[in-house]
């Protein structure tokens, strides 16, 4: 029912958009040459950390992206983002975001915004480009990889911004809160696969990974199993355009219940706190750090299947003219803290590791960009005892991307 509602809304807003005269249509094509020694990718049913594994060497489609924006009125805008990865998902081209945004004209130093639809929570300071992409690296940090895999706000978000700098103050402040549904499955991938580092976003009507192979074939994301709204609330501050901070608390408020046949799993109750800082001391340098810590658990049995998870990263980027160089260090950990299977397997599951990412980008022309990225990810994953792989692995991946944006 929820997916039918989203599809009906999609058709309705696109019909409304068709009546508008002015619109923006973006096209992005990303082609890559890949070399990897990584273990079987998490996107193909394995426990590797990276998007591509040792069987994926050669030319690959990074993505084909379409973005659509139209101003329906002076204060109302519609945004749609669609993407194709060429990895045989349920739909060859699928939506990642679709929402309407209302920004009433500010009559004072306070400005409101209301978003309704399906969109990303404003947690990331890294993924700043249209299509929720990063200008710094090809692969997202572990934190934002997970956001792209399992989190989407399907509901409404209200923001209230104090325009302090327009009034001569040193800072702007923003407060936001959202209510959402269709995210009772958040935590499924984190518990079963651990953290990852890639840029493959889950789509609104798709399955995780290649044709749903990484999880059971019928596993669907973004489903509403308990008819109970989740929420998040946060605040952001921007000091003179030099320092930006974001703080969020997220809770999907999933009601625990037995296995649901729609996902062949239980609903997962997931909550976390996130703090991010972005510092731009000069026109050339950008420093970003983000921290996220939370818990997720399922099962109506006792003890519950419970996990604690956290990750943090530090990214430094230098840009001058057509060149940009970026480096990022990630730490990540997820640890099972309770299990109703402990009597059978004798140990708790978990994932612990760190990764280095280096990237260099050159803008070749107005529409063409070349990006070279290398990742080394070290991880120890207890679940690998079931696949016969070494528990501790060092995985490396190189990608050379040629990107067209218009």
Residue ranges of model-derived segments:
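Outer-membrane beta-barrel pore domains
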Residues: 53, 99-102, 118, 242-406
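Sec/Tat signal peptide C-region and signal peptidase I cleavage site
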Residues: 18-22
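Outer membrane beta-barrel
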Residues: 23-36, 55-192, 236-243, 315-337
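Bacterial N-terminal signal peptides
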Residues: 7-17
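Surface-exposed strand-loop-strand hairpins of Gram-negative outer-membrane beta-barrel proteins
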Residues: 34-62, 220, 260-261
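Signature for the C-terminal beta-barrel architecture of outer-membrane proteins
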Residues: 24, 103-114, 149-314
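Transmembrane beta-barrel architecture of outer-membrane proteins
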Residues: 60-63, 79-81, 94-97, 151-155, ...
């Amino acid at each position: 029912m929820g997916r039918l509602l989203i599809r009906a809304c999609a058709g309705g807003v696109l019909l409304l958009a068709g009546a508008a005269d002015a619109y923006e249509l973006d096209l992005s094509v990303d082609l890559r040459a890949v070399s990897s020694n990584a273990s079987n990718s998490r996107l193909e049913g394995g426990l590797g950390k990276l998007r591509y594994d040792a069987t994926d060497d050669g030319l690959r489609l990074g993505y084909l992206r379409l973005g659509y924006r139209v101003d329906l009125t002076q204060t109302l805008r519609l945004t749609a983002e669609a993407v194709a990865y060429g990895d045989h998902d349920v739909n060859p081209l699928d939506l990642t975001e679709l929402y309407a945004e209302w920004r009433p004209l500010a009559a004072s130093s306070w400005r409101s915004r209301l978003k309704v639809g399906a969109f990303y929570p404003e947690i990331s300071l890294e993924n700043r480009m249209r299509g929720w992409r990063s200008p710094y690296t090809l692969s997202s940090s572990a934190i934002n990889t997970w956001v792209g895999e399992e989190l989407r706000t399907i509901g409404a978000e209200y923001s209230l911004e104090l325009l302090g700098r327009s009034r001569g103050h040193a800072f702007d402040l923003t407060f936001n809160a959202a209510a959402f549904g269709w995210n009772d499955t958040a935590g499924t991938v984190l518990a079963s696969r651990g953290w990852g580092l890639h840029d493959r976003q889950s789509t609104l009507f798709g399955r995780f990974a290649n044709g749903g192979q990484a999880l059971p074939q019928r596993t669907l994301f973004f489903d509403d199993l308990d008819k109970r709204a989740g929420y998040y609330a946060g605040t952001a501050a921007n000091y003179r355009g030099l320092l930006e901070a974001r703080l969020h608390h997220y809770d999907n408020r999933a009601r625990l219940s037995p296995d649901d046949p729609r996902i062949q799993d239980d609903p997962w109750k997931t909550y976390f706190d996130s703090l991010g800082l972005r510092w731009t001391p000069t026109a050339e340098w950008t420093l970003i750090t983000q921290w996220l810590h939370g818990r997720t658990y399922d099962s109506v049995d006792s003890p519950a299947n419970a996990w604690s998870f956290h990750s943090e990263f530090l990214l430094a980027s230098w840009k001058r003219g057509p060149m940009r160089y970026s480096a990022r260090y990630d730490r990540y950990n997820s640890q099972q803290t309770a299990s109703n299977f402990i009597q059978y397997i004798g140990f708790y599951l978990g994932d612990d590791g760190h990764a280095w990412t280096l990237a260099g980008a050159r803008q070749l022309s107005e529409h063409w960009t070349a990006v070279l990225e290398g990742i080394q990810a070290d991880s120890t994953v207890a679940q690998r005892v079931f696949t016969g792989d070494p528990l501790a692995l060092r995985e490396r991946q190189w990608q050379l991307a040629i990107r067209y944006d218009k």
